A protein has these predicted regions:
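C-terminal transmembrane-helix exit sites in multi-pass transporters
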Residues: 58, 110-135, 267-287
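Glycine-/small-residue-enriched transmembrane alpha-helix faces in small-molecule transporters
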Residues: 1-53, 81, 85-89, 151-187, ...
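Hydrophobic/aromatic residues within transmembrane alpha-helices
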Residues: 34, 42, 93, 120-122, ...
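Hydrophobic alpha-helical transmembrane segments of multi-pass membrane transport proteins
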Residues: 22-26, 30, 57, 77-96, ...
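Hydrophobic transmembrane alpha-helices of multi-pass small-molecule transport proteins
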Residues: 49, 54, 126-148, 155, ...
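Juxtamembrane helix-entry segments on the extracytoplasmic side of multipass membrane proteins
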Residues: 9-13, 35-44, 68-72, 131, ...
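Transmembrane alpha-helices of multi-pass small-molecule transport proteins
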Residues: 12, 36-85, 109-116, 176-181, ...
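Cytoplasmic-side transmembrane-helix entry/capping segments in multi-pass membrane proteins
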Residues: 14-17, 70-79, 125-139, 192-203
């Protein structure tokens, strides 16, 4: 597949996605420093300003790639709409169902959504290696979810069943849109468009779509230095820097692999909640983190042939020129 090389390039791509996931894992903890700012404002400032910064940083490349981007305008628009919907659903999910449940549902089910998209649209067949990694990661995130939800329900401020259900539903919307914009960006990149130009176009348009939401809900961000600092951090670090890294990663690994590697995010979020916010994580939660790490190891450890896995999916009927390294 064009744009997804073997060996070291795939390893570098995986590391870029993992680094992005670490940055994303800080967002839940950062948001706790601005408790008076609503989830729509947090999502709009994070992805909106972060997306516009990406567009500005990639402006020259985007202009040079404009003819090819216009030829794929449908994919660009799908990615941009998904970019706009994702943060609104994600942060609202965390506010309604809790940070643990919202993060785990949103990120933990994204690999399944990516797999469905690639199977239906690209007609790719999942391999045993990807399936094993996804099962480990989903089991780990489920344990994190159950452990932290049980711990939270033991406190005084339990959430309503209706709020939890709505929050979980919004988490599923976030997972689907995350998978969609990852797929769209990967499709543009592997179609010959430079990763910076593809990400700049998709996230720049998504940022423009989020500006009205930011104008309508963002006033509390300016009411205090802490709110402004959180907004600036969200836009610059996890969203701008994180998605630049994610774009580089998507140039070398499929969207299904990238979304599976990003299962590191809820594990990072849980650890930071313990170390920074002061939450307590039960044994089941730590077990979940270990399973997530095992999931990442399955995807990134070199195979017997000495190459790092680059595609955990194979096109049906395609006979590779050399033995595949995906364990299928």
């Amino acid at each position: 597949m064009k744009g997804a090389g073997r060996g070291p390039s795939a390893g570098t791509g995986a590391l870029c996605v993992l680094a992005a996931s670490v940055l994303w894992g800080t967002t839940g903890t950062a948001a706790t420093f601005a408790p008076d700012v609503g989830p729509l404002a947090i999502g709009a400032v994070a992805m909106g300003l972060g997306g516009l910064l990406q567009a500005l940083a990639a402006a020259r490349r985007t202009v040079r790639a404009a003819p090819r981007l216009r030829a794929h305008r449908g994919t660009v628009l799908l990615g941009a709409v998904s970019v706009a919907v994702y943060p609104l659903a994600f942060y609202s999910s965390m506010r309604l169902a809790g940070v643990a449940v919202g993060t785990v549902v949103s990120i933990g089910t994204a690999p399944l959504a990516s797999a469905v998209i690639e199977r239906v649209v690209d007609r790719r067949r999942l391999t045993r290696r990807w399936t094993l990694a996804a099962c480990l990661g989903l089991l780990g995130t489920a344990l994190l979810c159950v452990a932290e939800a049980a711990h939270a329900s033991g406190g005084a401020g339990g959430r309503s069943v209706a709020g939890t259900l709505v929050g979980t539903g919004l988490g599923l919307v976030a997972a689907a849109t995350y998978a969609l914009y990852s797929w769209a960006a990967h499709r543009l990149i592997t179609g010959g468009i430079p990763s910076r130009a593809a990400m700049g176009a998709v996230f720049g348009l998504g940022g423009l779509l989020l500006l009205p939401v930011l104008v309508a809900t963002g006033a509390p961000l300016l009411d205090s230095w802490s709110g402004a600092a959180v907004g600036a951090y969200m836009a610059l670090v996890p969203m701008f820097a994180g998605y630049v890294l994610f774009g580089w990663g998507l140039a070398h690994v499929p969207a299904s692999t990238a979304t599976t590697l990003s299962l590191l995010e809820p594990a990072v979020a849980a650890v930071l909640a313990v170390l920074v916010v002061g939450e307590r994580l039960p044994v089941a939660g730590w077990t979940g983190i270990v399973l997530v790490v095992m999931c990442l190891a399955v995807l990134t450890v070199p195979t017997r042939a000495g190459a790092v896995v680059r595609e955990e999916v194979t096109r049906p009927g395609h006979v590779p020129a050399r033995a595949p390294t995906t364990g299928s």
